[in-house]
Amino acid sequence: MIIERKRYIQQLLNSRHNGLLKIITGIRRCGKSFLLFNLFKRQLKLDGVDKEHIIEMAFDDFGNKVYRDPNKFYQYVKSLIKDGRMYYILLDEVQMLKDFEDVLNGLLHIPNADIYVTGSNAKFLSKDIITEFRGRGYQIHISPLSFSEFMSVYQGSQESGWVEYLQYGGLPPVILQPTDEDKIRVLKDLWQETYLIDILNRNRIKNNAELEELLCMLSSGIGGLVNPQKLSNTFKTNKNISIGSTTLKTYIDYCSDAFLIEEAKRYDVKGRKYISTPMKYYFTDLGLRNALINFRQIEKTHLMENAIYCELRRQGFNVDVGVVTVNGKDENGTSYRKQLEVDFVCNKGSRRCYIQSSLSLPSQDKIEQEINSLRRIDDGFERIVIVGESLISNRDANGILFMSIYDFMLNDL
């Protein structure tokens, strides 16, 4: 079964011949190697590139062990470049190549070499790899499957597919499992034996219980504001564990750096400035989030909000959490000041939109609640309410667009 990743293939095609090292990043098991060695290679051939001009090397293959020596590998590549036409060099698990940074920099000096790499050590599973090749690297970040990609292989209705996607996420080795029990087992194994170990080893964390407890707290509170000091107080009160807010923020940064979670900052829409704390965190994959807390607390409202955030990021938006400050007077003439929340403030180039997530709109009161912050924004940018049920897209008298979660998740904004 082949799951097409058209968005990423297009990004790879757009980056050809740009003189930079194409670095494919993303959490383990999200499909980086398959994208490069199957989908991208297939596209190159369809575009007329013959096999002699595609140089492949999977360094984790025992048969290629000899080429982990930097000199032998470099000479091997040089021996295959026989003319002035472009050669595409595809390298997997490149961290197993000794002195790989020096070798890759050397390959960049070959004028007719276009280089693409993936890796899965601590450096490649974090943002450090881009720092290593600053000015010479071009990152293509791969996420778990989108709902659209998931539905391309799911045998069932959109509604049942959506329920399963919220439950098990979009990691390819998970969704390809035949039963729910198998999906749960794979997710738990991946968390304990892969993702957790990566973060612990990379950052030399000795007390894995504290890290796991922190992630459980973040998992339980997706869509909620997170303040490290309040987390520290919770550890002390509920767990009788003394751990400082600075340490907790460092642990959160470790998880963010490993692409497991993402931070959304708060943005004052009217004041046009960022608010330092608190902020929100969303999980890169909902299946991993659910596995962390043993598939308890499966509230569709919060899962839907997380899924919308991830889809916006896939579509290339920078995403913040909006705050609209309202000043007024009550019926007694007493002045008040309150803050209304906009779930997402989304920016991409000159585009901006404001989005509210609502599982359902059963009454006019609920509709008024959801649009209360949006109708106070009058800067001319799109305002959208995404509803977690089927409906025909429509606009209200304020110009606010109402659309179903299916229309949003299956189409670009």
Model regions: which residues?
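Conserved P-loop NTPase "ATPase switch" module shared by AAA+ and STAND
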Residues: 82-100
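A cross-kingdom feature that marks ATP-driven nucleic-acid transaction machinery
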Residues: 2, 25, 34, 49, ...
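Pre-Walker A adenine-sensing motif
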Residues: 2-19
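Short glycine-rich substrate-engagement loop in P-loop NTPases that contacts/grips substrate
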Residues: 55-85
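Short regulatory helix/loop adjacent to the ATP-binding pocket of P-loop NTPases
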Residues: 106, 123-138, 153-155
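Interdomain hinge/linker elements that couple catalytic modules in large macromolecular machines
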Residues: 2, 148-325, 334
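Walker A/P-loop nucleotide-binding motif
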Residues: 19-37
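Structural recognition of the conserved hydrophobic beta-strand(s) that form the central parallel beta-sheet
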Residues: 114-120, 141
